[in-house]
């Protein structure tokens, strides 16, 4: 008997819920058609509608697209910085290498966090934006190419390659003009520029792609002339002649 009463109550509540839903829909339709406005009620319903439209899209964060693109991003970042540190230890020795060789700074972390936030917001609000696989694959190719160019630069230069600009000559420092350095003067910078922009194209992040390109380019546009001032001091006419023949490797930087 109690079970029958409980079932009847559930049935009545379900009927009332449907009736209330119909009444609410008809009421909102009539007020919108008649031009009546109820600011508080309208605001609440608009917020509910917007939330209801966003919440289902939260699942996009766990979709195949997000898992693939984000995993590629994390693997690219881990490999880049891990290999930088390993090569630095192998070339210069453990005692001469610090955690700065990982090339991770506060500004770099902020940029990466911003790019991830952009990705999460866009895949929730505009999931179709991330489905342009030819763009994402182009970015992946840029990441691989940039990685190869930079690592070739490090291996070719050997002990002449450091993460800090030399302001004083060293016994191990010599002018490298062979290998990848026959094509560009600063293949390490060229590789990083391609790699960093490629990570954002791989994520189909339009805002971060432009931001990364501008910020990284501006950094190298200031760094290269400063570094080459000392290279001319160290190698004189030899570097002057090399600089005239070979491009810098960074677009629009002589």
Predicted segments, located by residue:
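Membrane-anchoring alpha-helices and their flanking helix-loop junctions
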Residues: 2-177, 194-254
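Histidine-centered phosphotransfer motif of kinases
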Residues: 177-178, 182-190
């Amino acid at each position: 008997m109690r079970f029958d009463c409980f079932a009847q109550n559930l049935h009545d509540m379900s009927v009332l819920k449907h009736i209330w839903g119909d009444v609410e829909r008809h009421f909102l339709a009539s007020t919108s058609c008649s031009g009546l406005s109820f600011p508080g009620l309208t605001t609440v319903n608009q917020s509910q509608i917007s939330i209801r439209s966003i919440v289902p899209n939260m699942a996009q964060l766990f979709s195949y697209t997000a898992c693939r693109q984000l995993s590629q991003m994390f693997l690219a970042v881990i490999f880049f910085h891990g290999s930088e540190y390993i090569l630095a230890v192998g070339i210069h020795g453990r005692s001469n290498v610090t955690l700065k060789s990982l090339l991770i700074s506060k500004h770099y972390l902020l940029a990466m966090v911003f790019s991830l936030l952009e990705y999460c917001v866009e895949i929730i609000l505009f999931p179709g934006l991330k489905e342009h696989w030819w763009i994402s694959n182009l970015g992946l190719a840029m990441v691989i190419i940039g990685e190869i160019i930079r690592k070739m630069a490090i291996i070719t230069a050997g002990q002449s390659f450091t993460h800090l600009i030399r302001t004083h000559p060293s016994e191990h420092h010599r002018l490298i003009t062979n290998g990848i350095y026959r094509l560009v003067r600063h293949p390490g910078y060229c590789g990083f520029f391609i790699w960093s922009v490629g990570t954002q194209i791989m994520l189909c992040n339009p805002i971060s792609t432009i931001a990364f390109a501008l910020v990284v380019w501006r950094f190298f546009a200031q760094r290269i002339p400063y570094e080459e001032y000392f290279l001319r001091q160290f190698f004189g006419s030899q570097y002057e002649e090399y600089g005239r023949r070979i491009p810098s490797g960074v677009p629009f930087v002589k």
